[in-house]
């Protein structure tokens, strides 16, 4: 299972570079995506949690029990922020290590893409040339009709449209033929690229780097757990005043209710 996860992660990193190679864009790094998602999630939890606490304090039950949960919310929020930062640093180390370990795979895939692009380029240029020739051919046939339209009377408009229709259909059909030819020509290169990627994945799975990375990943997970312990302990300590306050309020309410029943 770990091997599958690492292979998928390697493909994700290599795929990001391949997409950048073809599209010439500037994609976010894997760490940026994870960090942005984690920050938004924790911020949403803190914001919504604060709203729920304020609503509970303002409710009739909260006022009756004198919960005052809002008094402890800032402390809990600070602990959550610290926990977020601790996890963030550890996770960034993991992504940096993973990207470094798979740099050779990204380089090989980039070279494969460059090779396939070089082979495909003549077919793309030929396709563009053929389409351009068809467009020019269409223009040459249409040009006399345009002159005829300008020089002729309005009643000839319908006749002109009837002449244009088959020419447009002919251009469409001939362009489709060129597209089919291009698709047939590019099919072997698509299969070649698929086989190359499969080969690179097999090399990755059989390499000593993957086995070594298994050990590093296990060590990292253990380290992550150790780093999380202090933050979780702080969170537990921050919750204790809230729980004690809640417990005292409930016991006080029960005591008052018992006294009222005894007085009756």
Curated annotation (Swiss-Prot):
The gene is APOA1. Sequence repeats lie at residues 67-88, 89-110, 111-121, 122-143, 144-165, 166-187, 188-207, 208-229, 230-240, 241-264. The keyword Transmembrane helix does not apply. It comes from Cavia aperea (Brazilian guinea pig). Participates in the reverse transport of cholesterol from tissues to the liver for excretion by promoting cholesterol efflux from tissues and by acting as a cofactor for the lecithin cholesterol acyltransferase (LCAT). As part of the SPAP complex, activates spermatozoa motility. The modification Methionine sulfoxide is found at residue 193. This is Apolipoprotein A-I. It comes from the Eukaryota. Residues 67-264 are annotated as: 10 X approximate tandem repeats. GO terms for cellular component: chylomicron; extracellular vesicle; high-density lipoprotein particle; low-density lipoprotein particle; very-low-density lipoprotein particle.
């Amino acid at each position: 299972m770990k091997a599958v996860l690492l292979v998928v992660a390697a493909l994700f990193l290599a795929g990001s570079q391949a997409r950048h190679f073809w599209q010439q864009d500037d994609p976010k790094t894997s760490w940026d995506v994870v960090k942005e998602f984690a920050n938004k999630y924790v911020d949403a939890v803190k914001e919504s949690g604060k709203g729920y606490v304020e609503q509970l304090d303002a409710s009739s039950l909260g006022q009756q029990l004198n919960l005052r949960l809002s008094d402890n919310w800032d402390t809990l929020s600070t602990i959550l922020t610290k926990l977020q930062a601790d996890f963030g640093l550890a996770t960034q180390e993991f992504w940096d290590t993973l990207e470094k370990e798979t740099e050779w795979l990204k380089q090989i895939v980039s070279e494969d893409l460059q090779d396939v692009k070089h082979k495909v380029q003549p077919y793309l240029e030929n396709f563009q040339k053929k389409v351009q020739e068809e467009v020019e051919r269409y223009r040459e046939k249409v040009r006399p009709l345009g002159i005829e339209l300008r020089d002729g009377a309005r009643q000839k408009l319908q006749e002109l449209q009837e002449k244009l229709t088959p020419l447009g259909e002919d251009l469409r059909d001939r362009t489709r033929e060129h597209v089919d030819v291009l698709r047939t020509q590019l099919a072997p290169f698509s299969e070649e690229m698929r086989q190359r990627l499969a080969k690179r994945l097999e090399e990755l799975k059989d390499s000593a780097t993957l086995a070594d990375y298994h050990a590093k990943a296990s060590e990292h997970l253990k380290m992550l757990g150790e780093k999380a312990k202090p933050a979780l302990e702080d969170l537990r300590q921050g919750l204790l005043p809230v729980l004690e306050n809640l417990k005292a309020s409930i016991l006080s309410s029960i005591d008052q209710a018992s006294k009222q029943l005894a007085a009756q």
